[in-house]
Amino acid sequence: MSSSLWLQCLQRLQEELPSAEFSMWVRPLQAELNDNTLTLFAPNRFVLDWVRDKYLNSINSLLNEFCGNDIPTLRFEVGSKPVSAPAVPKQTAADVAAATSAPAQLQARQSVHKPWESEGAGPVAADLNHRSNVNPKHKFTNFVEGKSNQLGLAAARQVSDNPGTAYNPLFLYGGTGLGKTHLLHAVGNAIVDSKPDARVVYMHSERFVQDMVKALQNNAIEEFKRYYRSVDALLIDDIQFFANKERSQEEFFHTFNALLEGNQQIILTSDRYPKEINGVEDRLKSRFGWGLTVAIEPPELETRVAILMKKAEDHQIHLADEVAFFIAKRLRSNVRELEGALNRVIANANFTGRAITIDFVREALRDLLALQEKLVTIDNIQKTVAEYYKIKMADLLSKRRSRSVARPRQLAMALSKELTNHSLPEIGDAFGGRDHTTVLHACRKIAQLREESHDIKEDYSNLIRTLSS
């Protein structure tokens, strides 16, 4: 009974939760049913407290659904039960194995002869069966999913399954180091893996400009056009670098149109929303929005922890949960910063032979942590929010309850919880001596509104970017 009941719960939770969240917190739980009491065993106190805090209501709801009137009492314990609980089957390693395929295939993905790069270049048709510059290490299987990138990942998967027909073009935008480039490569690899003769080209926008200049210098612009207009998928990173390059924009405009007419996939990334890219023609910006435009947000706490745990696992390093949380709570801006910090911690541990503890991390990252703590303060958050919403600081800290003041105040409280290490009572004190329960309510309300309101989600993301830059 316990096996089938908990397996039902696991399967439903796996459907409802981001994969990184499920794998980290729910999958390790074991279950035992005795005397109508369902005991869930967690590997340590940290996981137990987290599960009970975050998922208790969801688990109780599922038990109510599956058991009707005969609902078992739910208990939590640290440890493991005598007999192993059934596990949800893990994803296969087929995609990961593909990343270590034959050297010839790797070379084909990473290099390609471009016929306009030398004088007297001939037709390009013979050179099109390649996977140009697609990095085989970046797959969907090693992309850590979270609420911040869930829509972007889902769209990228759809495009890789149906290139040229689902979301064309796909435009991903967001700050530096959030995973946009990883998704570009993942799409390229997925297309190539399902169709080995697909012609997929990944490049930075500056490389497109450089290629066009070489083609003009070598009197080979027609070869350049045929090359780029004959690919099955064109993946261009950092499209904002086309700004103020009129000839490049002109050529890309015609290439863009030709690819769309041929149902060939286009994926673009930028550090900002298409209409906010200065120096790019309106006709191009309009076309960028013809398909699907998706924001990639800075990772939330749970995703940052999952990223650290995944990277530590890749390095075959054990990283304790509390250490991962210590790092994730203090480094919030992007994935690249997290990975760089973890690499520094691992290098220091290897050099010194010391265990990776919170004290060790505090020492290894002291300059980085000091900078972060100096950059983001509650006072800074309050001033930024007040300026963003064009309200007075005095009103933000007052007892006024009108929505024009209360909502920015709640946002500022939620941001203070997210971006600083202050406790709820300390945050409450900073907002006019409010109780910690008021701060907790504000955090929960903003979390709810970010799911329901596009405007609140956009405001929150804009403020995060401003405060983290």
UniProtKB/Swiss-Prot annotation:
Region (Domain II): 90-132
Keyword Cytoplasm: yes
Region of interest: Domain III, AAA+ region: 133-349
Entry's Gene Ontology cellular component terms: cytoplasm; plasma membrane
Cited SUPFAM superfamilies: P-loop containing nucleoside triphosphate hydrolases, TrpR-like
Any GO MF annotation of the entry: lipid binding
Residues annotated for ATP binding in this entry: 177, 179-181
Known function: Plays an essential role in the initiation and regulation of chromosomal replication. ATP-DnaA binds to the origin of replication (oriC) to initiate formation of the DNA replication initiation complex once per cell cycle. Binds the DnaA box (a 9 base pair repeat at the origin) and separates the double-stranded (ds)DNA. Forms a right-handed helical filament on oriC DNA; dsDNA binds to the exterior of the filament while single-stranded (ss)DNA is stabiized in the filament's interior.
Family to which this protein belongs: Belongs to the DnaA family.
Identification of the protein by name: Chromosomal replication initiator protein DnaA
Gene encoding the protein: dnaA
